[in-house]
């Protein structure tokens, strides 16, 4: 395999983003740059200099339509809510013929990708209890995921223990089954029917939930030389999540949060 340098990884991500954007424009699907990608668009008109990924959000109805509509010769949709070997529940659009190797786990993950998070409805009354109930269900996922705690030589031992547990307890739910239960409950709290909305399993906990109307209107901002959709209330959204996001973090914190290497596979 041939390693891909960080700048080329970004070029691939931007090509994936352009592919997603073309599909969404053709199908009338709403989406927005999100999280650090949105900060980058506002503050740098592109990537945050030390960032190395692209995050998007979509209202759940648009997210479901996108999963059905997206077709590409170069890229493929990976809906992680159907996976039994990872804890994530969102979607990645991955470049075919590439692979990312997690340095800590020492194993392949998926191809160079763009992340897409669904935005679901949330009740105003009892929000914290509702959110905590979803989190308790999510806590089951790593327990059922055979490689989640497996690092280095422990991977084989962990996998054997997992298989023996499955044989001894055949009724044990699989990781993807729990994810599907969670998604069914989230879809029941329909986007557009509730006063609040947010990404249940984003990184920012209860701060992820904000007025649903913030996800209804869109504008555009430049990102690496092209215009892309962003929610019109992007300033309110970013201040809710990050506070004064226009202030640069201390220099020691200006580092990537990810620990992987990307490669072209032999069949690329």
Spans of model-derived segments:
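A short secondary-structure junction signal
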Residues: 126-131
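Conserved catalytic core of two-metal-ion nucleotidyltransferases
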Residues: 1-25, 70-124, 142-153, 157-243, ...
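Active-site nucleotide-donor binding segment shared across nucleotidyl transfer reactions
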Residues: 21-54, 58, 63, 213, ...
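Hydrophobic, well-structured mid-protein blocks that either form specific transmembrane helices
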Residues: 132-137
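Amphipathic alpha-helical segments
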Residues: 61-62, 66-73
């Amino acid at each position: 395999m041939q390693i891909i340098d960080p700048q080329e990884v970004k070029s691939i991500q931007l090509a994936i983003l352009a592919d997603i954007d073309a599909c969404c424009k053709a199908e009338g699907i709403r989406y927005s740059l999100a999280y650090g990608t949105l900060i980058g668009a506002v503050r740098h008109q592109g990537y945050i200099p030390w960032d190395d990924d692209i995050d998007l959000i979509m209202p759940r109805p648009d997210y479901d339509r996108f999963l059905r509509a997206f077709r590409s010769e170069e890229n493929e949709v990976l809906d992680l809510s159907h996976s039994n070997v990872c804890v994530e529940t969102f979607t990645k659009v991955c470049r075919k013929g590439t692979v990312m190797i997690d340095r800590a786990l020492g194993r392949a993950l998926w191809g160079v990708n763009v992340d897409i998070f669904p935005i679901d409805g949330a009740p105003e009354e009892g929000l914290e209890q509702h959110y905590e109930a979803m989190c308790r269900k999510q806590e089951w996922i790593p327990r059922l995921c055979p490689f989640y705690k497996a690092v280095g030589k422990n991977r084989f031992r962990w996998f054997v223990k997992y298989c023996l547990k499955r044989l001894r307890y055949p009724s044990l739910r699989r990781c993807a089954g729990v994810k599907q239960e969670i998604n069914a409950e989230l879809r029941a709290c329909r986007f557009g029917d509730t006063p609040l909305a947010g990404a249940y399993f984003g990184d920012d906990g209860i701060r992820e939930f904000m007025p649903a109307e913030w996800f209804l209107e869109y504008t555009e901002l430049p990102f690496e030389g092209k215009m892309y959709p962003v929610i019109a209330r992007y300033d309110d959204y970013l201040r809710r999540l990050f506070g004064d996001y226009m202030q640069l973090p201390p220099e020691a914190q200006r580092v990537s949060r990810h620990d992987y290497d990307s490669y072209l596979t032999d069949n690329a």
